[in-house]
């Protein structure tokens, strides 16, 4: 079942946790590729110094953050890596969830950590060819190049590990907020 747009209107921290175990569907030249979401980070808009929309900063890059929840927000970091986010809440509350790691489906056996290609936000975008052309897409539409489904993969609260976000030291105390979530003991987690 495709997640409806209303799924993304909920509290961003809740959406970040609820996305764990859901399936990202990526339309490519070779068909639909699927990946289970393993790790996320919540970014809480104008009150969050780690968020691109902190203090209501509006730029060409952040335009998609000011759409209603359920749209994609893709930006470049370090001049070479793209990062995929899902916009949450409504256009009055520009918040998002960063997709930090996914597991390609169908799952493969006997993988080693050094062989993983989707255990980081830049790595997963490179692997699936996600770029700025994927910015602003409607994640609740099956016709979109990116959409998210619930395929009955159950995740209990005990399986979800909350911890500090990665790479946001510039945000002061907000860097320590426990807004990164990942599935306990999962091989594809980017950092423990």
UniProtKB/Swiss-Prot annotation:
Pfam families from the UniProt entry: Pur_DNA_glyco
Presence of the UniProt keyword Hydrolase in the record: yes
Xref: InterPro entries: Formyl_transferase-like_C_sf, MPG, MPG_sf
Biological process according to GO: base-excision repair
A single MF term (Gene Ontology): alkylbase DNA N-glycosylase activity
EC number, UniProt record: 3.2.2.-
Key words, A-Z: DNA damage, DNA repair, Hydrolase
PANTHER family: DNA-3-METHYLADENINE GLYCOSYLASE
NCBIfam families given in the database record: 3mg (TIGR00567)
Family: Belongs to the DNA glycosylase MPG family.
Name of the protein this chain belongs to: Putative 3-methyladenine DNA glycosylase
Organism: Bdellovibrio bacteriovorus (strain ATCC 15356 / DSM 50701 / NCIMB 9529 / HD100)
């Amino acid at each position: 079942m495709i997640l409806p747009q209303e799924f993304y209107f909920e509290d961003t921290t809740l959406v970040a946790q609820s996305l764990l175990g859901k399936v990202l569907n990526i339309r490519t030249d070779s068909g639909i590729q699927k990946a289970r979401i393993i790790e996320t980070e919540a970014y809480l808009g104008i009150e969050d110094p780690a968020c691109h929309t902190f203090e209501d900063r509006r730029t060409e890059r952040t335009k998609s953050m000011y759409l209603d929840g359920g749209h994609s927000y893709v930006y470049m970091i370090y001049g070479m890596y793209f990062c995929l986010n899902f916009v949450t809440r409504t256009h009055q509350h520009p918040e998002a969830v960063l997709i930090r790691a996914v597991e390609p489906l169908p799952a493969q056996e006997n993988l080693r950590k050094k062989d993983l290609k989707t255990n980081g936000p830049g790595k997963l975008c490179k692997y699936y060819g996600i770029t700025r052309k994927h910015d602003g897409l409607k994640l609740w539409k099956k016709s979109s190049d990116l959409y998210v489904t619930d395929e009955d993969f159950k995740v209990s609260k005990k399986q979800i590990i909350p911890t500090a976000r990665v790479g946001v030291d510039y945000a002061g105390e907000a860097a320590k907020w426990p807004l990164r979530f990942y599935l306990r003991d999962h091989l594809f987690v980017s950092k423990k």
